[in-house]
Amino acid sequence: MNILYFYQYFTTPKGSYGTRVYEFTKRWYEKGHHVTVITGVYAKSDIRADKFIENQEFNGVNVKIINISIDNRKSTLRRIWSFFQYMLVSCWYALTLKADVVISSSGPLTVGLPGLVARYLRGRKFIFEIRDLWPEVAIELGIIHNRLLIKAAYWFEKKCYKASTHIIALSPGMKADIENRFGYSNITSVTNSANIDLFGTLVKEPDLKGLIPMTYAIYNGNIG
């Protein structure tokens, strides 16, 4: 199966951001799927590019990097401009790249547009993944003030949910919020997890045969 994943914040474990998409896509590839991630250049990620569009590969996963800087330290207008640049280029990929399933990971909410393009113009299955509840987050953070923009953002949010083949929420609370507001049942909560292989292997317990009945004193250091 060909999976096309729109996610602006892709990073590997070398970066200082969540590796959920890195871990998931790596496992999908290992199961025989062809995976392409469309990402930007996030300040906390280790992903960097020299050209405007650059192809890199990680564990068999094709990562197309749109060399658009995303940094929370930038002004609100510059961040919004970065979101729209990524959205426009991603829509081109939604129209042209081979895909059976398209995943848009929000926020920002603008990442939903390439998913809608693939859904309505190409008839592809569209998975809308919710990491943050936009536009609520943007409103609370003061990114969106204008009433007309707020109304448009809520309309677009509803459109993305309605068009989705399935909705993925990263927490049970998000799932409940979407269900309560829209009444959709095609939603699953898939929480973040940890790759326990990164923490090493279990240490084999020592063989105590021959130590008993001798008496041993053990100093464990100062406690308290």
Q: What does each model-found stretch correspond to?
A:
Residues 4, 208-224:
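Conserved donor-binding/catalytic core segment of Leloir-type glycosyltransferases
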Residues 41, 173, 190-193:
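Carbohydrate-associated surface elements
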Residues 1-61, 187:
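N-terminal subdomain of nucleotide-sugar transferases
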Residues 31, 91, 95, 110-113, ...:
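Membrane-proximal helix-turn-helix segments that form the acceptor-binding/catalytic region
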Residues 61-88, 142-145:
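A short, charged, and often flexible helix/loop element on the N-terminal side
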Residues 14, 83-91, 99-136:
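An aromatic- and histidine-rich active-site surface loop
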Residues 82, 122-127, 136-159:
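Nucleotide-sugar donor phosphate/pyrophosphate-binding loop at the beta->alpha transition
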Residues 194-209:
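Acidic anion/phosphate-binding donor-loop and adjacent secondary structure
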